[in-house]
Amino acid sequence: MSRIELYDTTLRDGSQGEGISFSLEDKLQLTRRLDELGFDYVEGGYPLSNPKDAEYFQRVADLPLKNARVAAFGMTRRRDCAPENDVGMRALLASKAKTITIVGKTWDLHVREVLQVDEAENLAMIGDSIGWLHSQGRELLYDAEHFFDGYHANPDFALKTIQAAERAGARMIVLCDTNGGRLPSEIVAGVEAARRAVSVPLGIHCHNDCDLAVANSLAAVGAGARQVQGTINGLGERCGNADLVSVAANLALKIPGSEILADRGVTRLTELSRFVYELANMNFRASQPFVGGSAFAHKGGMHVHAVNRLARSYEHIDPETVGNERRILVSELSGRSNIVAKTTKFEIQHDRALMERILDAVMREEALGYQFEAAEASFDLLVLKVAGQHQPRFQRVHYRVNVETDQDSLPLTEATVKLRVGERVEHVVAEGDGPVNALDQALRKALLSAYPSLSQMQLVDYRVRVINSSEGYADSSAFLRAWSRALT
């Protein structure tokens, strides 16, 4: 199998997802990162849509990219307008992008009801736009919007549109499942029909409205597509686009002979995924295949026992292949194998009786509502206590939190903490923005002189668990545990 091109449209299609916006610097940073990993194309945006995208193309031209070609995205000319007079066409040329991706209508429904032109004019719009841009020395890719819906409704016309693009000079025809509603079998049928109709290479662009974007993309490759368009982490409008992280991992690791990315690019997929989540100011998706924090996390005792003996018994690939790592979780569902795996870093005797006592302690705590899966430090403290090796750094005498209103009727939270630190007793009061912040400030005041490194530690997140949902209140000890867990 020849090289499969990866065309990333995170900066254009991905930014159309709800709540997602990339700054100009974000766009340039991601372009550099994608180039480092060996992506073939980076679609930077639509130059006519906003000043930020227009400036991006001016700035990106100065980047010393080694692998990726930067593409500008645009639409066909307007009806009854020559391409050289069309503002969109002129903006694409002004972007100075060497590659231009033009999207055009393939579904006769859109031609009649959205563009409100006849079929002949739509074919002319496609041919004129691609032909004029091609004559200006640009590489042209044609996105056949709604191709699979169009092929289902009117196969002859759908195929005529991509033939018009080929005749005008498109290097590649990209077949789009724009509504994300087609099944893999329909994708295969459409790709095979397109291969019979045109001789230029085909690409695939799938949306995820049926949770099939990755599967449909891989099915298209199997049917002969040589480019996959998508976004990192599947970002995009509605339900998103094909996740290029999963696409790349599957192509590299599951389909023999596929050539993708640069040397060691696949091993950086986890890094790339999390980098994009950070740029988009989004939380990582724990269950994301290949790169999620839970992708290689094992909780059931039988599973952990088997993984400790032979990792591939419960893992389809080595986590390090994609830059991820194996995690052993501890919970009330755990067996002794989980406990043994999680306590190897401690200098304790790993006898059966101690492992059982630790497991019993975990079960008792979780029965009260605590969780240790994302609380590594809390579990470590529990192990040391059960093993008789815990040396407390301080002792809590008592604490109190008051929530009142000030003279302007604004909430005012005050925490009082009394601790025994060595031979001294620290009794302090602090105000904060809510109970957790007030307790954080009070504890810092009490402990900072003994433990100066606390000044380098920040409380970045916390959780409050409602222990008895029918009563609708949070248990105070669970509340405090959530705070101390986040701090450690």
Summary of predicted features, one role per range:
Residues R3-I4, T10, A249, I255-R424, ...:
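A mid-to-C-terminal "edge-of-domain" accessory segment
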Residues I4-L6, Q16-V42, S49, F57-L65, ...:
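Alpha/beta enzyme core
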Residues I20, Y46-N50, R78, E119, ...:
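Hydrophobic alpha-helical scaffolding
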Residues K66-F73:
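A glycine-rich helix N-cap at a beta->alpha junction
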Residues N179-R182, V188-N308:
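Catalytic alpha/beta core domains of metabolic enzymes, predominantly
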Residues S258, N283, A446-Q456:
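Active-site phosphate-binding and catalytic loops of NTP-dependent enzymes
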Residues D433-P452:
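A short, contiguous, amphipathic alpha-helix enriched in charged residues
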Residues A450-L487:
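Generic long, charged, amphipathic alpha-helical segments
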